[in-house]
Amino acid sequence: MGKLKEMLAEDVTMMIASDHGFTELIYEFHANEWLQRLGWVKYRENRKNSLEDVSLGSKAYSLIPGRFYINLKGREPNGEIKLEDYENVREELKGMLLEIEGPEGGKVIKSVEKCEDVFTGDHVGIAPDLVALPNDGFDLKAGFGEMEDVFGKGPRNGMHTFENALLIIDRPGMEIEGSNLYNIAPTILGLMGIEHDPAVFDGESLI
């Protein structure tokens, strides 16, 4: 970074940002295999290769990364759960997720968030009902193929995290504590002196 900084003119601000952190990967957790063994996911006869194979009788299914959908009647193609039972089923699934332990002990899931607490905007209607965030060392997978076990080992020994992202702005007086990805685009426009309508951004410029 020092060499890059030396290449810049004195009136140029260097900004370096990442959208994720990094951690070790010990086990993959196959969410749909877990749900199937608990009787929460059922498939069409002799088929379990895709989301289309999820059949009546299913309570929920998972898509990566850590997204869980209640099989709600009227919303899902083969919906099973009635609207009046939705919240109870969602709370039950949340509790089950938080109790999962890895092969060597320790909790797999760090937290489980409800959709209305993390998503906003025009497309919130297609957001997952629950979002599970793993503890370090676990990668939440959601394939629909045949799995030997709920936990497995993959080819990688590292993975992204949702935390510990990097942000460096080489400009005196910049306050980046508590900032997030929403701040990046308006900050870049501000640094470049480009006029824009702040109302179209979810975040504010850090300048």
Name every feature range the model reports, one short phrase each.
Residues 2-143:
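Secreted, luminal/periplasmic, and some membrane-associated catalytic domains
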Residues 9, 39, 114, 157-158, ...:
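Glycine-centered flexibility motif
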Residues 133-185, 193:
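Low-complexity, glycine/alanine/valine/leucine- and proline-rich hydrophobic stretches
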Residues 188:
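Phosphate/pyrophosphate-binding loops and the adjoining catalytic core of nucleotide-dependent enzymes
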Residues 195-198:
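Short, polar/flexible loop-turn hinges at active-site or ligand-entry regions and domain interfaces
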Residues 200-207:
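Cytosolic regulatory/linker segments at or just downstream of nucleotide-handling modules
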